Amino acid sequence: MSWDSYIDNLVAQTKDASGTAHSDRACIIGLDGGAPWTTAGHANALKLQGTEGANIAKCFKSKDFSAFMAGGVHAEGLKYQFLREEDAKLVLAKKKGEGAITLQASKTAIVIAHCPEGGQQGNTNKGVSVIAEYLESLGM
């Protein structure tokens, strides 16, 4: 099964009334180990590097976000400043000049999306939430 269509759906969910998407890249990784579910070949793929996926998954699996608080959230070789977590399922982070990332866990996956600098992270949060909650409704 290809998960890449979920990236398209997520980006579409972030559009505002004028049709502007507020997420330019996204991916889905497994909660158990951080292996990618979406492919890096997708035009809007958020490409985690090295151990980034495993480190993100470790924090969500353990529900211990102290590593994010102390060292930031690493994605695509960049360090984003941890802003907050909610309900041990949602993490928000930002990097000046780069934008922000939203991460939300379902039962078996973590949905991650990037909001470009100047975009509305709230719209990105909505897109991530729609996909994560859909996966959750499927028992995933």
From Swiss-Prot:
In its UniProt record, a GO molecular function of this protein is: actin monomer binding
Per UniProt, the keywords (alphabetical) are: Acetylation, Actin-binding, Cytoplasm, Cytoskeleton
The record's section on InterPro entries has: PFN (IPR048278), PFN_euk (IPR005455), PFN_sf (IPR036140), Profilin_CS (IPR027310)
Give the UniProt entry's GO cellular component terms: cell cortex; cytoskeleton
Q: Name one GO biological process term.
A: regulation of cellular component organization
Presence of the UniProt keyword Acetylation in the record: yes
Where does the record place it?
Answer: Cytoplasm, Cytoskeleton
Against Gene3D superfamilies, the record matches this protein to: Dynein light chain 2a, cytoplasmic
Write down the SMART domains for this protein, in alphabetical order.
Answer: PROF
Carrying N-acetylserine, the residues are: 2
One of its Pfam families is Profilin
Q: What does this protein do?
A: Binds to actin and affects the structure of the cytoskeleton. At high concentrations, profilin prevents the polymerization of actin, whereas it enhances it at low concentrations. By binding to PIP2, it inhibits the formation of IP3 and DG.
Q: Which family does it belong to?
A: Belongs to the profilin family.
Q: How does it assemble?
A: Occurs in many kinds of cells as a complex with monomeric actin in a 1:1 ratio.
State the name under which the record lists this protein.
Profilin
- UniProt source species: Clypeaster japonicus (Sand dollar)
Species lineage: Eukaryota, Metazoa, Echinodermata, Eleutherozoa, Echinozoa
